[in-house]
A protein has these predicted regions:
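Helix-loop element at the rim of GNAT/NAT acetyltransferase active sites that forms part
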Residues: 11-12, 16-29, 66
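A conserved beta-turn-beta hairpin within the catalytic core of GNAT-like acetyltransferases
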Residues: 65-76, 86, 133
Length: 141
């Protein structure tokens, strides 16, 4: 297994994986343009390649803080691994990218939200050193 940062060069393979996740079948995904967001200095998307294709990904965002400390947080926006490839260390390898990003950016920490009805993800994050303090509500407008 290898972990790759998503760029314009491997974006088609990444889209193929997203299509596979959404449609349940592996085939070339139609794409128009590589999104400009991939060049955002605070967005990091990594994917795990196994058997010649991407089988999971993590999307990370660095959110700077305006304060005396001037250190922000790395946020895990999404983490997904294809069911066939779960329990093979892929999710932990992807989370390791968040740890590296935290170190590289000298961030205060890593934050994420996990649904309380998702015990598999909760157990994964706990095994990777995350701890929960309070329940939170996800709200959207």
């Amino acid at each position: 297994m290898t972990i790759e940062r998503i760029t314009s060069e491997n974006y088609q393979d990444f889209c193929d994986m997203l299509y596979w996740r959404a449609k349940g079948k592996e085939e070339k995904a139609p794409i128009e343009d590589v999104p400009d967001e991939l060049n955002d200095r605070n967005l990091y998307v990594y994917a795990a390649r196994e058997e010649g294709r991407f089988v999971g990904w993590i999307s990370l965002t660095y959110l700077p803080k305006v304060s005396r400390v001037k250190k922000g947080y790395v946020y895990v926006d999404e983490l997904w691994v294809a069911e066939k490839y779960r329990n093979h260390g892929i999710a932990k390898a992807l989370i390791a990218e968040a740890d590296e990003m935290k170190t590289k950016l000298d961030a205060t920490g890593i934050r994420l939200y996990v649904n309380e009805n998702n015990p598999i993800a909760h157990n994964l994050y706990t095994a990777c050193g995350f701890s929960g303090e309070d329940k939170a509500y996800f709200m959207e407008k």
